[in-house]
From Swiss-Prot:
Isopentenyl diphosphate binds at H86, H179, S311, S312, N313, S374. Catalyzes the conversion of 1-hydroxy-2-methyl-2-(E)-butenyl 4-diphosphate (HMBPP) into a mixture of isopentenyl diphosphate (IPP) and dimethylallyl diphosphate (DMAPP). Acts in the terminal step of the DOXP/MEP pathway for isoprenoid precursor biosynthesis. The active site is at E181 (proton donor). Its cofactor is [4Fe-4S] cluster. It comes from Gloeobacter violaceus (strain ATCC 29082 / PCC 7421). The gene is ispH. This is 4-hydroxy-3-methylbut-2-enyl diphosphate reductase.
Length: 417
């Protein structure tokens, strides 16, 4: 987008907002653990922290730009098209700063985005996930100020999809079709199909090789395909792309599956006319997944994964622990550690909030901890401090009897996705 009202970089105010960012999101405890080889021992409790976790540079950039925007346009109405990142603490801070969310009403309830509320005098922030081309066009016509915090890795996927489009290839996007990033990516392709996992990719490849029931195919993939998608026409030339937060290994397997499929269907000599691919998993996602694979090799009693419940990359971190057979719990903050007996967490399979009993073993314990790319160090530190508290361990390492205050009383919860 070329416009005097469009800003893709910061406003040179990072130094001015740095103190606020440090106070709200950083932690001296996390600095200590990093300096101590990502391990902290107190009393009979050992915490092993993944060597890559929490805020990635794309998230850091987006949050910093939002704070700079707040300072740059003081006195003007600021909007954001949806959550800037998938972390409740960060988004709540933005609300407290007076930034309004286009997908929320006055009471904070989720509603369809209402761009009619935006005036020419307003400022609209685009989140780290980006925005669809349709939303960009609406905002451009509003002639309002647009501050684009889209992660550069997401933009790289858009460039790849654009290349496929120009070559008249259908984009096969490994992702969740309702995720904000995938919605934005798909909007940049005339023809696309979103596959959630290797199983769905296999269904598509089986259709490419053997044909099948077109109506049944569209019934299954209808919500995940472009308007007018025709599997008999649109699966002849395909290019692989992905939501940047998906499991790297699965994206690679999906790419190889489509490559083998097109080679079988059209022959090795014609592969380039029918298949294109490029690695678009972001470095930060890969680093956190690699660190998680390393962490689960440690002798752990359990693992705590911290991140927003709608965070895709956090969910995939927990999948690694589950596949390894480790007791693991996805929480969004320290208040989910209700007591030494009870923990409230998001169940990986039901995607709902559940309560588990006897989650924290008695006696000596080793706890692995990691966090998704949208989780501030401060939240990680609060969780670690709560674990020590529940084990009766003070900052000095001394142990003693403690009470277990109930921080949350819900026995369960509604579906989270």
């Amino acid at each position: 987008m070329q416009s005097k009202n469009y800003f893709r970089k910061g406003f040179g105010l990072k130094a001015e907002v740095q103190d606020d960012l440090k106070a709200e999101y950083e932690s001296s405890l996390i600095h200590e653990i990093r300096a101590n080889g990502y391990t902290l021992r107190r009393g009979g409790v050992t915490v092993r922290l993944a060597e890559a976790f929490g805020f990635c540079w794309g998230v850091d950039k987006a949050v910093s730009m939002a704070y700079e925007t707040h300072r740059m346009f003081a006195g003007r109405q600021l909007w954001i098209t949806n959550e800037i990142i998938h972390n409740p603490l960060v988004n709540q801070h933005l609300r407290a700063m007076g930034i309004r969310f286009l997908d929320e009403d006055e009471s904070g309830r989720r509603v369809p985005k209402d761009f009619e509320r935006v005036s020419e005098k307003d400022v609209v922030i685009l989140p780290a996930f980006g925005a669809s081309t349709q939303e960009m066009q609406i905002l451009d016509e509003k002639n309002c100020v647009i501050v684009d915090t889209t992660c550069p890795w997401v933009s790289a996927v858009w460039n790849r999809v654009g290349k496929y489009d120009r070559a008249e290839f259908t984009s096969i996007i490994h992702g969740k079709y309702q995720h904000e990033e995938t919605v934005a990516t798909a909007s940049r392709a005339r023809r696309y199909l979103v596959v959630l996992n290797l199983e769905e990719a296999q269904q598509v490849c089986d259709y490419i090789l053997h044909g099948g029931d077109r109506r049944a195919f569209l019934a299954h993939f209808g919500m995940a395909a472009c308007e007018g998608f025709d599997p008999d026409r649109d699966l002849v030339r395909v290019g692989i792309a992905n939501q940047t937060t998906m499991l790297k290994g699965e994206t690679e397997r999906i790419g190889k599956l489509f490559e083998r499929t097109m080679m079988r269907r059209y022959g090795p000599a014609n592969l380039a006319d029918h298949f294109m691919s490029h690695d678009t998993i972001c470095d930060a996602t890969q680093e956190r997944q690699d660190a998680m694979f390393k962490l689960v090799e440690e002798p752990l009693d359990l693992l705590v994964v911290i991140g927003g419940y709608n965070s895709s990359n956090t969910t995939h971190l927990q999948e690694i622990a589950v596949e390894r057979g480790l007791p693991s719990f996805h929480i969004d903050g320290a208040d989910r550690l209700v007591s030494a007996q009870f923990i409230e967490h998001r169940d990986l399979h039901s995607k709902s909030l559940v309560r588990t009993k006897n989650w924290l073993p008695a006696g000596e314990v080793t706890v692995g901890v990691t966090a998704g790319a949208s989780t501030p160090d401060r939240v990680v530190a609060e969780v670690i401090a709560r674990i020590f508290e529940l084990k009766g361990v003070g900052e000095s390492g001394a142990t003693g009897a403690i009470s277990s205050p109930v921080l949350s009383s819900a026995e369960g919860g509604p579906s989270l996705s």
